[in-house]
From Swiss-Prot:
This is Origin recognition complex subunit 2. It comes from Xenopus laevis. It comes from the Eukaryota. Residues 136-145, 193-202 have a biased composition (Polar residues). Signal peptide: none annotated.
C-alpha cells in the first residue's frame, strides 16, 4: 500500500498483495522469533497450524481464519469510509475482492504425495462416528476430538488428479493401509473382495441347491400351465374298431366267461352255504306275514334261484326279472291274473285289475302265491305308480314277496306308507358274485348289440312329456314301422309329418312342432338329415324290435 501526492492532495493506491509477500513484511525469512506481539503474529501461528498434517483439520476452516485475521491487520486504526478519501480503512475495501490463490490445490496435492508415511482417514459411512480410522500410532488413537471439529479429512482434490498423483507411489506404499481415494465404488469393491472368500469357504454348496430349487419350482409352474392350457387336445384314434378280433355275440361272450376260473372259489362257496342255511328261517317269516328283502355286494340271482328250487318246487310262484328293459307294473299284474289266477280276460285299467287280484285272494284264503323279484330297484320300476302297485300286492296276506336290491339308495324309493305296505325284513347277503344276467341288457362295446336299454330310456323320457308330445312320437314310430320293408326308406319329411300332426290336432303351427322335435333330438330319440333335394327328413334311430315293444306297451297302457 502506498500513497502519492499530486496537486497538494494525498491519494491512496490499493494493490493486492499475496500471502507470501505479506509474511515477508511481518516475519523475517530465516524463521526468527517475531519482533512484536501484533496481529501479524497470529497469522503466523494460524499458518503453522494449517501446515501441521497430524491434526487433519479441514482446509476451509483455517483459510477463513486467515482471511479474517488478515483483514483485521489491514484495517487497524482505520475508521473512515471509502468516501472520506485518505481515512478509508483497508478492511472495508479489501472485503469487496475475491481472494485468488494460484496453484494452491496443486501445491497441496504435491505436499500430500511427498508425505506417504502419514495416514489420512476418509469418511466412508453416513454416520461420522463410525468412520474408519487406521491405527497409525497410539498418540492419534488416544486423541479425543473436540466438540465441533472432525478428525477425518475429507479430500476436496479432484478424483482424476489424486489418481495420477497416487499411481506412481502405489508399489512403494507398503506402510499405508488405505489409499488416498474417496470413491465409494472402490471402497465397496474392496470390501466385497475381502468378504467373498470367507463366505465361499464356509458354505460352498448352498448356491447350487438354491438355484436347483428355483429351477424345479419354475418347471412345475410351467408344466401346470401347459397341462391346463386351452389348446386343443387331440383324441387318440386307438379304438376297438382297430382290433383284429371282431365283436362277439352274447353266447360267445358267455361261454368265454364260463371258461374263466373264478378266484377265491372256496371262500365264495362257504359264503353261499352260510346264506343257504337261512332258507327255512325266511320261509317261516314269510308265513308270519313279513316280506324278505336281500341287499349286499354281488349278484343275488343264484341265491334266490336256489331258494326257489329247494323250497318252492311244490308251491305256486312267479319269478320276475326286473332288469329286463321292457318290464312294467302292468306286465306283472298280467302275469298274476293270467298265469297264477287263470283269468284270460282283459281289464279296462290297472286299477280294475288290481281290485280283481285283491278280491280273488280275499275270497280264497287257501290260495298262496310266492312272488320272487330280482332287482326291485331297477330303472323300470322306480316310479311312484309302480312302487304303489307292488306295495299293494305285498300287503295281501296270502301273497309272499322275496326281492333283492343293489342300489345303495334303494330305500329312498319308499316313504312311511309304502314301508308299512311292504313290511320288510332286511337281510345282508353279500355274495361277491358277478352281475352277468343283470348287465346282459346293458350297452357293451364288446357285444354286437345296439341299444338294449333303448326301450327303458324311451319309456322314461316319454313319461315326462305331455300327451301331445307322446302322440307326436307315436305317429312317427307308426309311420316308420309301416315302411319297415322299404329298403330305400330315408325318413319322413318335415312337411308331411307336420301335416299328419295337424290333422291329428297335436300341433297348430310348425314352430310348436319344431320345439317338440328339438326336445326329442336332445334325448337322442330322433335324428334329422337333409336329402339331395334339401328336404329335411325325420328318423327314429331304434331297431324294429324296440319300436314294436314300445307300440305294444303304449297299446296296453291306453
Amino acid at each position: 500500500m502506498s500513497h502519492e501526492a499530486h496537486n497538494g492532495t494525498k491519494l491512496f493506491k490499493v494493490q493486492f498483495t499475496p500471502d507470501e509477500e505479506v509474511l515477508e513484511h511481518i516475519t523475517d525469512k530465516q524463521g526468527v522469533t517475531p519482533q512484536s506481539n501484533t496481529a501479524a503474529q497470529r497469522i503466523v501461528a494460524v499458518k503453522n497450524i494449517i501446515k501441521n498434517d497430524d491434526l487433519h483439520v479441514d482446509e476451509a476452516t483455517p483459510e477463513s481464519w486467515r482471511e479474517q485475521n488478515y483483514v483485521d491487520v489491514l484495517g487497524v486504526d482505520t475508521e473512515d469510509t471509502l468516501q472520506n478519501g485518505p481515512g478509508t480503512g483497508g478492511g472495508d475495501v479489501y472485503s469487496f475482492y475475491t481472494i485468488k490463490r494460484s496453484n494452491k490445490m496443486a501445491q497441496l496435492a504435491t505436499e500430500m504425495a511427498r508425505t506417504p508415511a502419514k495416514t489420512v482417514s476418509f469418511s466412508v459411512s453416513d454416520n461420522p462416528e463410525e468412520a474408519v480410522s487406521p491405527p497409525a500410532n497410539k498418540q492419534t488413537e488416544n486423541k479425543t476430538p473436540s466438540k465441533g471439529r472432525k478428525n477425518e479429512f475429507i479430500s476436496t482434490t479432484p478424483h482424476r488428479l489424486r489418481k495420477r498423483l497416487s499411481a506412481p507411489s502405489q508399489p512403494s506404499d507398503s506402510e499405508s493401509d488405505y489409499s488416498a481415494s474417496n470413491s465409494d465404488e472402490e471402497l465397496e469393491e474392496k470390501s466385497s473382495a475381502a468378504k467373498t472368500p470367507s463366505k465361499v469357504s464356509q458354505t460352498p454348496g448352498k448356491t447350487p441347491s438354491k438355484k436347483g430349487k428355483k429351477n424345479t419350482a419354475s418347471n412345475l409352474v410351467e408344466e401346470y400351465f401347459e397341462a391346463h392350457s386351452s389348446s386343443k387336445v387331440l383324441t387318440s384314434d386307438r379304438t376297438l374298431q382297430r382290433l383284429q378280433t371282431p365283436k362277439l355275440d352274447q353266447e360267445t361272450l358267455r361261454k368265454l366267461l364260463d371258461q374263466t376260473p373264478s378266484a377265491f372259489a372256496d371262500e365264495l362257496h362257504r359264503i353261499s352255504k352260510k346264506h343257504e342255511a337261512l332258507f327255512y328261517k325266511w320261509m317261516l317269516q314269510l308265513h308270519l306275514g313279513f316280506n324278505i328283502i336281500l341287499f349286499g355286494l354281488g349278484s343275488k340271482q343264484s341265491l334266490i334261484e336256489k331258494f326257489r328250487t329247494s323250497l318252492l318246487q311244490d308251491s305256486l310262484h312267479i319269478v320276475i326279472n326286473e332288469f329286463f328293459p321292457s318290464i312294467t307294473a302292468k306286465s306283472i299284474l298280467n302275469s298274476i291274473t293270467e298265469e297264477a289266477l287263470g283269468h284270460p280276460g282283459a281289464f279296462r285299467s290297472p286299477l280294475d285289475q288290481m281290485d280283481f287280484i285283491l278280491q280273488r285272494f280275499k275270497d280264497d284264503p287257501s290260495l298262496e302265491l310266492y312272488l320272487l323279484i330280482h332287482n326291485l330297484d331297477s330303472q323300470m320300476l322306480r316310479g311312484e305308480k309302480c312302487q304303489q302297485v307292488l306295495g299293494q300286492l305285498a300287503s295281501i296276506p296270502n301273497l309272499h314277496l322275496l326281492a333283492s336290491v343293489d342300489h345303495i339308495n334303494a330305500p329312498l324309493m319308499w316313504d312311511q306308507s309304502k314301508q308299512s305296505l311292504y313290511n320288510w325284513l332286511w337281510y345282508e347277503t353279500t355274495t361277491f358274485g358277478s352281475y352277468i344276467e343283470e348287465t346282459s341288457y346293458e350297452n357293451s362295446l364288446l357285444v354286437k348289440r345296439s341299444g338294449a336299454l333303448a326301450l327303458s330310456s324311451l319309456t322314461h323320457v316319454l313319461r315326462s312329456l305331455t300327451p301331445n308330445a307322446r302322440g307326436i312320437f307315436r305317429l312317427l314310430a307308426e309311420y316308420q314301422m309301416a315302411n319297415k320293408d322299404n329298403p330305400s326308406y330315408t325318413g319322413l319329411s318335415f312337411q308331411d309329418f307336420y301335416q299328419q300332426c295337424r290333422e291329428a290336432f297335436l300341433v297348430n303351427s310348425d314352430l310348436t312342432l319344431r320345439a317338440q322335435l328339438t326336445e326329442f333330438r336332445d334325448h337322442k330319440l330322433i335324428r334329422t338329415k337333409k336329402g339331395m333335394d334339401g328336404v329335411e327328413y325325420l328318423l327314429i334311430p331304434l331297431d324294429l324290435g324296440t319300436l314294436t315293444d314300445f307300440l305294444e306297451m303304449e297299446d296296453k297302457d291306453t
